[in-house]
Every structure is written in C-alpha cells, then in structure tokens.
Amino acid sequence: MPEEKQKKSVLEKALKRIEENFGKGSIMILGDETQVQPVEVIPTGSLAIDIATGVGGYPRGRIVEIFGQESSGKTTLALHAIAEAQKMGGVAAFIDAEHALDPVYAKNLGVDLKSLLISQPDHGEQALEIVDELVRSGVVDLIVVDSVAALVPRAEIEGAMGDMQVGLQARLMSQALRKIAGSVNKSKAVVIFTNQIRMKIGVMFGSPETTTGGLALKFYATMRMEVRRGEPIKEGKDVIGNVISVKIVKNKVAPPFKTAQTYIIYGKGIDREYELFNIAVNEGIVDRKGSWYYYTTLKGEEVSLGQGSSNAVQFLKDNPEIAGEIERRIREKYGLLSVEKEEQRKEKKSSGEEAS
C-alpha cells in the first residue's frame, strides 16, 4: 500500500509538471468523465449523411477526406458544410486550388459570400501553408481544400513539361499533414480535403481505384467519405439532378462503412425536404395510407401532408415548423442532437418565451 501511494504521488507530480510545461489538456486520464467530452460537429447539410457519420456531421478538430469521380457531388457537399458552419456563426475558408469555384452556385446553396474567406493559390506549397496558418489562428471553424489533385508542387510548375517528377505531391502532402494534424486538433477546426479517383495500371485483383496525393491523407483523415453518382432525377423528360450515394469508408469517431443516399438538384444543391420525407417514411414517423401521407405531431394532432410523395415534399417545404419537428425526432432517435445545435434551440426557445 505505501508503494502504491508513493507511485500515485509521483505520477500526480509528473502530470502536474507536464501540464505546467505544455498546457492544460496535454495529458489526461482517459477514463476521467470530466475529461471526456462529446464529439462536437459541423453538420454536413444532409440528414442522411449526418446519420451515416454516426456523430451528426464532420467532427471538429479532425481532418476529413471526401473523394469520388468527376461530377459526383464532392464540391457540393463541401459548400453545404461551409453554409452549415456559417449558420452556426463560424468562420469558413475555401482554398480553391482548382480555380473553379462558382460563386452563384455557392450562394444558391446558402453560402454567405460576404463572410467567406477564399484563396486561389499558385502552387501546392502555398495552399497548404495558408491552411496551416488559418488552422493555427484558432478562429477559423472550417477549411475546405478543393482539391488534392490540384495541389501541384512548385517544382513541377517551374519545371519543363516533360520532366519526371516522381512522388513530389505525395511528399508534399506527407510533410504538410504532419504539421497540420496537431494544430487542427487544438484549434477545433474541421479541414475537408476533396480528392479525385485515379486508376492503378496493371491491377489484376481487387479494385484498381485509388486517390491522388499518396497515402498520407488516408492515414491522417479521421473520416473518409466516398461519393458516387447514381441514377438521374427527372421532372418529366428533363434531368434536374442526381441521386448521390455516400459511403463512410473510414471513421475514427463512430462505426465505419455506413451508407447514405441523398438527392442533389442542379443549381440548388441537396433537396433536404425530399431527403427528410424519405427518411421519415422509412422510420415510420410519417405514415402512408393508400396514396396519402400523414404525420402525427408531438401534440397528438394528425396532419395530412398530401396525396403522393411530390405533394408531401411540397407540404414540408411550405411548413418548415413541421419539417423541423420531424427532423428533430429523427436526430433524437439516432442520438444526433449536437451540443451546439441543442443550445441554440434552447436559446431561441427561451428568447421567444421572454418576448411573449
């Protein structure tokens, strides 16, 4: 027993010295309930994807990779994340390495262009230095890098067209992520990298698909999301959008390999009400009787949403209070009411009661 007490005393002194030298929180006991905090997130902008992540969105203090084929919806998801971060009062930055950001489309998705930080870097080193500086500032909540494939090293840009530059981009990403990863965790920012798919030559077995930029991002990313474009969404004979399937291929904060399906309308982004309606029907929150759809409110009142899915979706668009109540019930069912969102809702409710 005396030896145990002595060990405990020595350990406490060591922990105290570490905290004095490196700051509070630099070391902690994992099982201490006062130290373990729920995962803070920035919503994805899609209820289905929020559910698939297992925590309700992109985890703060982490690196996220969104990858997929061309025109699969990667940038759309990134812009929706920016809009959500701004709604929460956060600061967002967009590193446009592709030099292809459409401000009109971003605005249609809900992005506040007046407060959005944007950079169009000349080369990969500049882009990643800007990311590092923004993360270290501690005041930026979300940084999107679009995309890894466009982060061309300076040596490649300055070299001749036919020069062999083996592994330059992979080394650049590896070096940069070593610096950024530690800073991200302390700043509580989310850094989203969008990435493209390439084909490995000569693969006989397994998938020939891989992502650009080497292996570093795969290791440092807390969450990796694979985006694939599905069947077209039609209005009559006209194609107005696409079904998008998302698979969480890596997740360090919740069980991985969950999938989600969402609906992107060209020029408008994710159709939230259509997505909400489908989830609510599948979860039994919205009832179907013949071709009619009904919802029973928390007060016990049965509300008719309309005949047919299109009318029901339009009803949800026209009645955001009911849509919001349905969404909260779904989030509560999956335990996804984040601390920040819940606090905002309580503040709005209390301010409304005070006003009345």
Curated annotation (Swiss-Prot):
* Matching CDD domains: RecA
- Cellular component terms (Gene Ontology): cytoplasm
UniProt KW ATP-binding keyword: yes
Give the species this sequence originates from.
Thermotoga maritima (strain ATCC 43589 / DSM 3109 / JCM 10099 / NBRC 100826 / MSB8)
Matching entries from Gene3D superfamilies are given as: P-loop containing nucleotide triphosphate hydrolases
Binding sites annotated in the UniProt record for ATP: 68-75
List, alphabetically, the PANTHER family matched: MITOCHONDRIAL DNA REPAIR PROTEIN RECA HOMOLOG-RELATED, RECA
Please indicate which superkingdom the organism of origin belongs to: Bacteria
GO BP: DNA recombination; DNA repair; SOS response
Entry's localization field: Cytoplasm
| One example GO MF annotation | single-stranded DNA binding
Tell me, what does this protein do in biology? Can catalyze the hydrolysis of ATP in the presence of single-stranded DNA, the ATP-dependent uptake of single-stranded DNA by duplex DNA, and the ATP-dependent hybridization of homologous single-stranded DNAs. It interacts with LexA causing its activation and leading to its autocatalytic cleavage.
Write the record's keywords in alphabetical order, separated by commas. ATP-binding, Cytoplasm, DNA damage, DNA recombination, DNA repair, DNA-binding, Nucleotide-binding, SOS response
The record's family statement is: Belongs to the RecA family.
Kindly give the Pfam families that the UniProt entry links to this protein. RecA, RecA_C
Q: What is this protein called?
A: Protein RecA
| InterPro entries, sorted | AAA+_ATPase, DNA_recomb/repair_RecA, DNA_recomb/repair_RecA_CS, P-loop_NTPase, RecA-like_C, RecA-like_N, RecA_ATP-bd, RecA_C_sf
